[in-house]
Amino acid sequence: MNPAHLLVLLAVCVSLLAAANIPPQSLNLLQFKNMIECAGTRTWMAYVKYGCYCGPGGTGTPLDELDRCCQTHDQCYDNAKKFGNCIPYFKTYVYTCNKPDITCTGAKGSCGRTVCDCDRAAALCFAAAPYNLANFGINKETHCQ
C-alpha cells in the first residue's frame, strides 16, 4: 500500500477514535421523553397527539386533566423563555431518575434548571392523570376551539 494512503487511513482512524470520546449531547426533548418514561408506565408516544395541548401547539380548552398537564407544561416553557437566551426545546439539563422519582439538579433559577423543573412537573402530572384513549389523535380543528 502506498505510504500516502496509509497516512490518510491513519488520520481517519485517529479522528474516529477522538470523536468516539466526545459525549453525545442529547436534546431536551430526548431528556423529556426519558423523564416521562421514568415517571410513569406509558411511552412518550402516548402523549404526542393527545388532546388539545399535548404535542406541538395548543389552543382552546383542555379536554381533561392530562391535557391540562400539557397546557401547564406549555405555559412553563413560555415562562422559561423569559430568560432571554433560553430555548426550552433545546436546552439540556442534569437530572436523576430513580423510578418513579425525578430530581433536577443545577443552579436554581438557571435556564436549565427551570426547563428541567417544567419537564419534571409535566412527567409527574402525566403519570398521575387518567388516560382517556378517546382523546388521543383527536381532530384539533373541531375539538379545540
UniProtKB/Swiss-Prot annotation:
Entry note: cofactor: Binds 1 Ca(2+) ion.
Similarity comment: Belongs to the phospholipase A2 family. Group I subfamily. D49 sub-subfamily.
Function: Snake venom phospholipase A2 (PLA2) that inhibits neuromuscular transmission by blocking acetylcholine release from the nerve termini. PLA2 catalyzes the calcium-dependent hydrolysis of the 2-acyl groups in 3-sn-phosphoglycerides.
SMART domains with a match to the protein in the record: PA2c
Descriptive protein name: Basic phospholipase A2 2
PANTHER family noted in UniProt: PHOSPHOLIPASE A2 (PTHR11716:SF94), PHOSPHOLIPASE A2 FAMILY MEMBER (PTHR11716)
GO cellular component, one term: extracellular region
GO biological process annotation, one example: lipid catabolic process
Residues excised as propeptide: 20-27
Disulfide pairings: 38-97, 52-144, 54-70, 69-125, 76-118, 86-111, 104-116
Tissue expression from the record: Expressed by the venom gland.
Cofactors: Ca(2+)
InterPro entries listed in its UniProt record: PLipase_A2, PLipase_A2_Asp_AS, PLipase_A2_dom, PLipase_A2_dom_sf, PLipase_A2_His_AS
EC numbers on record: 3.1.1.4
GO molecular function: calcium ion binding; calcium-dependent phospholipase A2 activity; phospholipid binding; toxin activity
Catalytic residues as annotated in Swiss-Prot or TrEMBL: 73, 119
Top-rank EC class of the record's enzyme: hydrolase
Signal peptide: 1-19
Binding site for Ca(2+): 53, 55, 57, 74
Catalytic activity annotation: a 1,2-diacyl-sn-glycero-3-phosphocholine + H2O = a 1-acyl-sn-glycero-3-phosphocholine + a fatty acid + H(+)
Subcellular location: Secreted
UniProtKB keywords: Calcium, Disulfide bond, Hydrolase, Lipid degradation, Lipid metabolism, Metal-binding, Neurotoxin, Presynaptic neurotoxin, Secreted, Signal, Toxin
UniProt xrefs under Pfam families: Phospholip_A2_1
